[in-house]
């Protein structure tokens, strides 16, 4: 119960790509409204929440719209512990797709916003 699974007729690679895209869009919004120092305060919560709702509405029937490996890991683990259906063969869809989507979005946002003067991303710690 609550475990994510692909829809009928959705291939392994289609599902992984869908999870990639969903997480990519979510991460782009997070970067733009929550991480970017020049983002207008007060809109991050509603923007991120509406993006999650939109991704779920679009991807729900195809992949269950996990967009977070932990969202899939917990139900899969409990299914295994409680003797339910074994869905671990699908786990790479929900691990690789979202992680690659988030990484690509972070780099894409940094690249697209760096020269526009709009973006000021936090810098890593420098111990010098």
Q: Residue ranges of each PLM-predicted region?
A:
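Membrane-interface helix-loop junctions and terminal tails of multi-pass membrane proteins
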Residues: 1-128
């Amino acid at each position: 119960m609550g475990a994510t699974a692909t829809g009928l007729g959705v291939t392994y690679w289609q599902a992984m790509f869908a999870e990639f895209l969903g997480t990519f869009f979510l991460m782009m919004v997070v970067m733009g409204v929550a991480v970017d120092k020049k983002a207008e305060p007060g809109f991050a919560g509603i923007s991120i929440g509406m993006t999650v709702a939109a991704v779920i509405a679009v991807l729900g029937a195809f992949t269950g719209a996990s967009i977070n490996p932990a969202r899939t890991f917990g139900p899969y683990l409990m299914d295994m512990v409680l003797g339910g259906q074994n869905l671990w063969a699908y786990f790479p869809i929900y691990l690789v797709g979202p992680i690659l989507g988030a990484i690509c979005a972070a780099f894409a946002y940094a690249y697209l916003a760096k020269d526009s003067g709009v973006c000021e991303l936090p810098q890593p710690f420098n111990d010098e």
